[in-house]
């Protein structure tokens, strides 16, 4: 009788531990911190919704690729774009482009980060943009090209820095428009939580 009671108690304890562990272990969402010459901000990534995009972005982060790049395209009330050019407006060499993950349930709303690309839907490499307004017309369901832009995370702290960047004065430089007059430099991007 005592042995049956002990077995029942042990079984109940193990079941409780498994349920508690499952409930306490939500999907790991990495947090990445951007340090710029205008302040810092933190982005939470969505690897479940955009696994290829997040894996690609994290490879660039971990390799130090973004250090010394700039936000080269800034449009107030729309977005800030960076992650591919240096202060001389020269594009850095990138890895191969990735497949578009724009139909992942995430939308281009204020404070989200998405991959920049050319007119080819599967051309995203290192460049990204942060929406400073709700830009739902960039979602696959509403985009003029039927493809849209892949959101893969959101700013969870430091949005005031993003807004400050979005408010800088811009100019045309070479064949680029909307280039900040004073360079907005990404000093460092690092993983501060998750893998």
At which residue positions do the language-model features occur?
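Cyclophilin-like peptidyl-prolyl cis-trans isomerases
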Residues: 2-8, 16-195
